[in-house]
């Protein structure tokens, strides 16, 4: 009976150790994914800002071609 208790204890202990190792690796992977997401958001913000500037500049040029100016004349 004591042998079974020790064996069961050993199996449970090893299971918990392997589970904690897997959780730790999972957290590290999630942290790496978060860093990648932040980089993607940063690049998207830069592209979005450049697009807004490009559209604003294009609208000004179109307004000049049509004959409208900022003074409303």
Curated annotation (Swiss-Prot):
This is Ocellatin-PT6. Keywords: Amphibian defense peptide, Antibiotic, Antimicrobial, Cleavage on pair of basic residues, Secreted, Signal. It is found in: Secreted. GO terms for biological process: defense response to bacterium; symbiont-mediated hemolysis of host erythrocyte. GO terms for cellular component: extracellular region. Residues 23-39 form a propeptide. Pfam families: Antimicrobial15, FSAP_sig_propep. Expressed by the skin glands. Belongs to the frog skin active peptide (FSAP) family. Ocellatin subfamily. Residues 1-22 form the signal peptide. Has antibacterial activity against Gram-negative bacterium E.coli ATCC 25922 (MIC=120 uM) but not against S.pneumoniae ATCC 700603, S.choleraesuis ATCC 14028 or against Gram-positive bacterium S.aureus ATCC 29313. Shows no hemolytic activity and no cytotoxicity. InterPro entries: Antimicrobial15 (IPR012518), Frog_antimicrobial_propeptide (IPR004275), FSAP (IPR016322).
């Amino acid at each position: 009976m004591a042998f079974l208790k020790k064996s069961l204890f050993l199996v449970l202990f090893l299971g918990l150790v392997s589970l904690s190792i897997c959780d730790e690796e999972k957290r590290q992977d999630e942290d790496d994914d978060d860093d990648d997401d932040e980089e993607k958001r940063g690049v998207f913000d830069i592209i979005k800002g450049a697009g807004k500037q490009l559209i604003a500049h294009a609208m000004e040029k179109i307004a000049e071609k049509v004959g409208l100016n900022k003074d409303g004349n």
